[in-house]
Amino acid sequence: MRPAILALSIFLLAASAPAVDREAAKASYRQGNEFFDQSRFADAAAAYGHAIEQDPQFLEAYYNRALSDEMVDRQKAIADWRQFADLAANSPDFKYQAGQGSARIQILQMLPTYPDALQPSHYVSSAADYYAEIAETSESERWTTYPIKVAIGNVPEANWAQGAREAFSIWKEMLPLELTAEPEEADIRFNWDPDQNMEGGEVGEEMDWVQFRREGNELTGRKVAFISVDLSRRWSKDEMRAIVLHEMGHALGIKGHSLSKGDIMYFQVQEKNRQVRVPGVYYPFAWKTLVSKPSQRDLNTLIRLYNTPGVVLRMK
């Protein structure tokens, strides 16, 4: 090729490349961060996309877009993480984040197809969530087969049984649960032993165990959640419903507590009325008005827990 023609080709190629507008990209990126912090994940992903259009080498925007799309569309998130990992592999400053991206791709690909109630489309941005408060203790606590089978068992008092059944029915309206009379078939089981000891004045507790079975030459394990309630107190039906709602929230994956008194995973502090203790909290709690069902924040937290493959913070 003649030198003049080669020079012209290079000029035309450079002219056709998109112009980089770093200031505009930074403005779009800041907007994306604001949306992300407001739990407006679809808007955040779009804003980060604009930042990438304005600066195709803006690695932080690729990273945060992938995080946002985890709460929008799993396949988009996988594509985003691949794009980020490919670009970051050539940048020494982003070597660790590139590894994070590759790991998240693997986890996202292994996650099952969730029931409709756990899809990101049911996340209500205006209600937000308390995922950051429970994420580290709740990671890998997702149920992967549905419906989740629950055995309430033989409840010693009729009003307690009614409260427990009401709690089950409330959660069943939101998630695919199935009541079973066979404890060995259940994923979530209740212990109504009146002689059980609760530590530190706790009203109830939830614990997870792995149950092993031998099938031929193979040993298989499955997670089982056990819920216990302090039966030494004279609970009303509504109090039992609130206790079971709360403990089932733990069993479904929320291994922590909300800081908002409107959530079922928080018990309101009061000076009067009945006082109880919540596991892991070292001061008395009491009910003045009982939360009657999981809040949208409770549901949002479950949705985010099930769709987010581990705890990472967005880039600043």
What are these language model-derived features?
Residues 30, 64, 97, 101-104:
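Canonical tetratricopeptide repeat
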